[in-house]
């Protein structure tokens, strides 16, 4: 048995083991926040069952952290029974770590300082805002910035919009003020995010497991976020890029290694 007990077979149980280790005095200085499906489940205790009801399965455990704590992050996850993928570190170590465990064949992704997928989402100064996940605004953007979005991402987004209202704060709210600030300076992010909000809304009638009240609340919150986004003054950079529109590619393609969240 390792320092923090045995690796657990269930994703939720393994998540808890890692979070418990982070709460110990020797690790409290490490800023490591859940992202991905497990983060949505953690932040949606009331409606987390949506993932099960709609067929959403867990495939890995993902975190966000700070590059300045790279050594401490690797040390902790190694003590938890994971082994650093040195090749990934050599290729992407300034913003990405991958660690593996052999018992159940799982891996942990750790994204450092930013989420860099179809669009870049900076995280510096934001990881301290919430715990044990990244803030709700970043959870929404994490999914809504994916150009080739999957159904699993749509399910996660429906769930978070059912559980949490949109407002101008981070505490148990989806921070529409912050999201609108980011989309008002980046036309590409605005284009992808607003398009995906419409797609999420269109999926609400697909799932008979959802009640009319579920659909009403999710639609209401999507519309509230749209109101924030539409009302935010757009930067000169945004306006200049909007003139070009979709004639020029507005997003980055995501490599297979990065498409795991």
Model-derived features with residue positions:
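N-terminal regions immediately upstream of nucleotidyltransferase
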Residues: 1-22
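Active-site nucleotide-donor binding segment shared across nucleotidyl transfer reactions
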Residues: 19-74, 134-135, 243-246, 250-261
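Short, flexible active-site-adjacent loop segments at beta-strand->alpha-helix junctions, enriched
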Residues: 38, 69, 103-105, 114-116, ...
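Short, solvent-exposed polar/charged micro-motifs at secondary-structure junctions
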Residues: 43-45, 96-100, 120, 181-183
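Generic beta-strand structural signal
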Residues: 61, 95-97, 106-109, 130-132, ...
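Conserved catalytic core of two-metal-ion nucleotidyltransferases
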Residues: 74, 78-119
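Catalytic cores of NTP-dependent nucleotidyl/adenyl transfer enzymes across multiple folds
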Residues: 112-261
């Amino acid at each position: 048995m390792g320092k923090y007990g045995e690796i657990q077979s269930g994703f939720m149980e393994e998540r808890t083991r890692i979070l418990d280790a982070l709460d110990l005095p020797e690790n409290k200085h490490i800023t490591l926040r859940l992202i991905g499906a497990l983060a949505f489940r953690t932040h949606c205790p009331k409606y987390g069952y949506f993932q099960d009801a709609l067929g959403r399965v867990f495939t890995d455990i993902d975190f966000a952290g700070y590059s300045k704590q790279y050594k401490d992050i690797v040390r902790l996850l190694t003590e938890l029974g994971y082994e650093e993928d040195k090749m990934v570190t050599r290729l992407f170590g300034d913003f990405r770590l991958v660690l593996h465990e052999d018992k159940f064949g799982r891996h942990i992704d750790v994204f450092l300082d930013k989420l860099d997928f179809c669009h870049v989402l900076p995280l510096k100064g934001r990881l301290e805002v919430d715990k044990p996940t990244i803030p709700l605004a970043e959870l929404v953007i994490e999914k809504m910035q994916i150009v080739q979005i999957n159904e699993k991402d749509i399910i996660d987004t429906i769930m978070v919009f059912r559980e949490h209202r949109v407002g101008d704060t981070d505490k148990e709210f989806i921070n529409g003020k912050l999201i609108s600030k980011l989309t008002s300076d980046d036309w590409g992010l605005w284009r992808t995010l607003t398009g995906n909000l419409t797609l999420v809304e269109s999926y609400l009638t697909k799932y008979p497991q959802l009640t009319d009240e579920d659909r009403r609340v999710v639609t209401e919150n999507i519309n509230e976020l749209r109101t924030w986004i539409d009302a935010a003054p757009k930067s000169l950079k945004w306006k200049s890029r909007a003139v070009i529109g979709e004639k020029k590619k507005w997003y980055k393609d995501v490599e297979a290694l990065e498409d795991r969240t």
